[in-house]
Amino acid sequence: MNIINLTPHAINFLREDNSVLATIEPSGMIARAAQTREAVGEVNGIVVNQCSYGAVTGLPDPQPETIYLVSALTAQACRDRSDVFITDDAVRDENGRIIGCKAIARI
């Protein structure tokens, strides 16, 4: 199975002992959901926006034996695609930074 990383970051998949099973480097393409925002009010001087997400750009057409890793926001915008996945079960270091994940998931 081909795994294509459509995010700007390398993704580490970790074993149960947190050793690295595989690292999927960025492909150089980034899939993104178009975003629109409209100011709808304010709270204590802070602007409140209404955001909506539309068409996805940068997502290749489905290919045999290929899955695509994208951001959760992008995956939500293309739920009809069975080949689009997000990282799941994040692992963090002692400072709270994500160092990898143990699974992938569909939205």
Predicted regions and their residues:
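Catalytic phosphate/metal-binding cores of nucleic-acid and nucleotide-processing enzymes, i.e., regions
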Residues: 1-107
